[in-house]
Design a protein with these regions (language model features):
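Single conserved hydrophobic/aromatic residue that forms the stacking wall/gate
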Residues: 1-14
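Extracellular ligand-binding/catalytic regions of CAZymes and related secreted enzymes
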Residues: 32, 104, 131, 217, ...
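A glycine-rich, often tryptophan-bearing local segment used as a flexible ligand/cofactor-contacting loop or short
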Residues: 89-168
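Catalytic beta-strand/loop cores that center a nucleophilic Ser/Cys/Thr
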Residues: 152-226, 234-241
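Amphipathic alpha-helical scaffolding segments comprising HEAT/armadillo-like alpha-solenoid repeats
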Residues: 283-292, 313-325, 344-356, 378-381
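Short inter-helical turns and helix N-cap capping residues of alpha-solenoid HEAT/ARM repeat scaffolds
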Residues: 296-297, 327-328, 359-360
């Protein structure tokens, strides 16, 4: 034969990959094509959660893109790009100046861009910070960026109520905030933005951050950029059960798409109706539960999951995956409930696998209910 069987397999895989790219570039049923940047500086959980949020919209399809993909022309096959949370300057370094100019040209041509937390920071015009200068804002008090995190309150402006009518009658709504930038208008670039929401929570739990810095500041801002649009969120709706749908709605705004209703299973702002900020004592307790999951008894693990879910722990979502396969059926069931009740779609396939291999029939039935509850977030095909 001309090629060895191993080489033949490689060529087959390459052919499948190229066919997949071809299908993606054409779109599926004219779906909007969204790329989530996956590079050094982007937090892995933020990438997972951003992908999951886009999957809630029946008119969108999503993939990850790397800095090499951008250089190779991947933006030609996208309608919108999302820069997720993590560390904005590190994402800047990973992208490189030429790729950032490719992204700017992509937006100028009429496409959309959404920046989440670090992504919003990257979009600013902040002196002394590596950024792209595309959203008309600048960050202040950057020496206290590690100011804290937790479920935080915001209020919508008149324009924000048009984009998020599901929240229009609420005085306040709540999503996860994690050390996002404190924004004011840039002094240097004439790029006006519209404030869609105002932060109502004063976060200064860590890093000797001053009080009254985050409250009454822009929470969501949106602007025109050439023929395209940019939306910047200093918070993490994608990491907030019941509020993940806000991310595809932001994408819709950047592409001038109509507002469409999502199901009641997806839109659930009543899950959080108060601030839940992590204090230093809370953070110490949270860190201790890492060891509990390694060495604790079943009852200790379940108690830890109860507390971590109640306070909407940021770190716990990275720890629960393996608990689906704990030696204790009670722990396995509680881990499944944690994942389902926190709408953690990134672990849907793990939960499905756990259900399939579960040996205890009562536990299996309960876990299957949690699986179906989580799966119900996805639009019907």
């Amino acid at each position: 034969p001309l090629y060895s069987s191993a080489a033949s397999d490689v060529y087959k895989r390459q052919a499948v990959y190229l066919v997949g790219l071809s299908v993606w570039s054409m779109g599926v049923g004219n779906k909007v094509r969204v790329g989530v940047f996956q590079g050094n500086g982007g937090a892995q959980t933020c990438i997972w959660e951003t992908i999951a949020s886009i999957q809630l919209d029946p008119d969108m399809m999503v993939r990850t893109i790397t800095t090499g993909d951008i250089a190779n022309g991947a933006l030609r096959d996208l309608d919108a790009i999302i820069i997720p949370g993590g560390e904005g300057a590190t994402q800047y370094m990973n992208l490189g100046e030429e790729n950032m100019e490719r992204i700017r040209n992509f937006i100028r041509s009429g496409k959309g861009a959404v920046g989440i937390c670090a992504g919003a920071y990257l979009f600013t015009d902040t002196p002394g910070y590596a950024c792209m200068h595309i959203n008309g804002g600048k960050a202040i008090d950057i020496e206290h960026d590690n100011r804290g995190h937790g479920i935080s309150a915001f209020s919508l402006t008149a324009e924000g109520k048009k984009l998020f009518p599901e929240l229009a009658k609420r005085d306040k709504s709540y999503v996860m905030y994690y050390e996002g930038p404190v924004l004011v208008k840039s002094d240097n670039i004439p790029l006006p933005y519209t404030t869609m929401a105002i932060m109502e929570t004063d976060v200064h739990e860590e890093g000797n951050a001053p009080a009254n810095m985050t409250n009454n500041r822009p929470f969501f801002i949106a602007n025109e950029y050439g023929k395209g649009r940019v939306f910047s969120s200093i918070s993490h709706p994608e990491a907030t059960p019941g509020m993940m749908w806000m991310i595809p709605r932001m994408v819709r705004w950047t592409l001038r798409m109509p507002v469409v209703a999502y199901s009641k299973r997806v839109v659930n702002p009543d899950l959080y109706n108060r601030e839940i900020l992590m204090t230093k004592d809370d953070l110490r307790k949270e860190r201790g539960y890492y060891r509990t999951f390694l060495y604790g008894s079943p009852n200790e693990k379940i108690a830890a999951l109860d507390w971590l879910q109640a306070c909407r722990s940021w770190d716990a979502k990275r720890w629960v995956q393996g608990l689906l396969f704990d030696n204790s059926p009670a722990v396995r069931e509680r881990a499944a409930r944690f994942i389902a009740e926190t709408d953690y779609l990134p672990f849907l396939s793990d939960l499905e696998a756990a259900c399939r291999v579960e040996r205890d029939e009562q536990t299996k039935q309960s876990m299957m209910r949690h699986f179906e509850h989580l799966k119900a977030l996805l639009p019907h095909k």
